[in-house]
């Protein structure tokens, strides 16, 4: 069959008629200069990926940057907002109620540039929890009131599970357990930041996360279209009828019925639009001469709440499982991290089954858990995650991987105390040994984005991530530096620590609640 050429902006794109050709081109590009221990793994993983993923983007050196700290993330956000010319599009769980400086920064950008448009997508339950007091919705409403919804399009996604008796019975403090808009996308013109961080003061100061900046118009366009699609399944903040109020509507322009009116029809319409987006995206395949591009990035997402139960077209879970199941020899290592350590059983099983000689799991110490010494029921969450860590170590022992897989707790001071930090990073790194140093591992694959790889991430929430595969030595060194920066605040934890340290004792009630409510954590 002949191949048709689709003319777009650089990098070039081509429509592919054969999935086998698609896979072989990527293999030639990546394996030609890849570190030799990783070649066979790369060949296997690219064959596997082509069955599941329809879209990828090629990057040249210096088109991906890793942001080092919360303060750098905040400074970069403000800088990008101020310099944006055409569009700012942001997806986050929530906007902190004290973030007036960020709102002012956006307002100033809109004032000085009449061509600029701003799009926000937040979670509708988390973003309105404090109403009528100050909250995400009231802050965004002030922008809409000043500039109008034509220039400031603010959307609030509400899970379709928030319906019927659940809407009436479940208190505001707990309704987030039904499902959330959890994507973290920060787009500015032709650049985009993918992260796990939200928009509040702790994420800008002392809450450890990860942040990658991608400089590509095509990549930014993809996430902008994704942002707009999920926004079209969401409520909109429009100009209030009374100054200071918040006016939230379901726009007639939305392509689906309001979920509160007909949940089944909403899911049918939304899932079809999502499936169309994921399928149409297969036509955006960047192809170039072998070796020209050093990095390939695959967007992967999880939209389980919007798909029928047995017809989930999401791409994240299957991709993560493929990454891990294709590790077949000891020349590959991995590091896994999640601040909220309630790992999906299938992912855990795949991690434990890998034939690694050295691998790390990084999770938050109880003293770095954002719920440490919080009020009410949430004060039990650090204990719940501690219990899950112990169960993981028991599984490691059961698999006879005690010498190969190390659980490490991250701690930097004590959260909510002077100079104390919390831990919110999540991700996966897959590494090979550096050819120049037989004792050193260097990543050539990482996953960056919003997912905590938990049971709820694959059942209740909307997640978006990116899988990066690279042979760019500078980027690999940056990835290694990022990982080392996290590891420097960790210490290994063993089953013996749980036996000897009374502070690691978890009560029976917390254990039972963790087992019952595990899907919500």
From Swiss-Prot:
Coiled-coil region(s): none
Record keywords, A-Z: ATP-binding, Lipid biosynthesis, Lipid metabolism, Mitochondrion, Nucleotide-binding, Phospholipid biosynthesis, Phospholipid metabolism, Repeat, Transferase
GO biological process terms, semicolon-separated: cardiolipin biosynthetic process
Active site positions, chain numbering: 182, 184, 189
Localization, UniProt: Mitochondrion
Cellular component, GO, one term: mitochondrion
Binding annotation for ATP: 91-98
Disulfide partners: none
EC number of the protein: 2.7.8.5
Annotated PLD phosphodiesterase domain residues: 177-203, 419-457
Main location: mitochondrion
Pathway in which the depicted protein is active: Phospholipid metabolism; phosphatidylglycerol biosynthesis; phosphatidylglycerol from CDP-diacylglycerol: step 1/2
Gene Ontology MF term list: ATP binding; CDP-diacylglycerol-glycerol-3-phosphate 3-phosphatidyltransferase activity
Catalytic activity annotation: a CDP-1,2-diacyl-sn-glycerol + sn-glycerol 3-phosphate = a 1,2-diacyl-sn-glycero-3-phospho-(1'-sn-glycero-3'-phosphate) + CMP + H(+)
SUPFAM superfamilies to which the protein is assigned, alphabetical: Phospholipase D/nuclease
The keyword Membrane is annotated on this UniProt entry: no
Family label: Belongs to the CDP-alcohol phosphatidyltransferase class-II family.
Function: Essential for the viability of mitochondrial petite mutant. Catalyzes the committed step to the synthesis of the acidic phospholipids.
PANTHER family: CDP-DIACYLGLYCEROL--GLYCEROL-3-PHOSPHATE 3-PHOSPHATIDYLTRANSFERASE, MITOCHONDRIAL, CDP-DIACYLGLYCEROL--SERINE O-PHOSPHATIDYLTRANSFERASE
Name the record gives this protein: CDP-diacylglycerol--glycerol-3-phosphate 3-phosphatidyltransferase
The encoding gene: PGS1
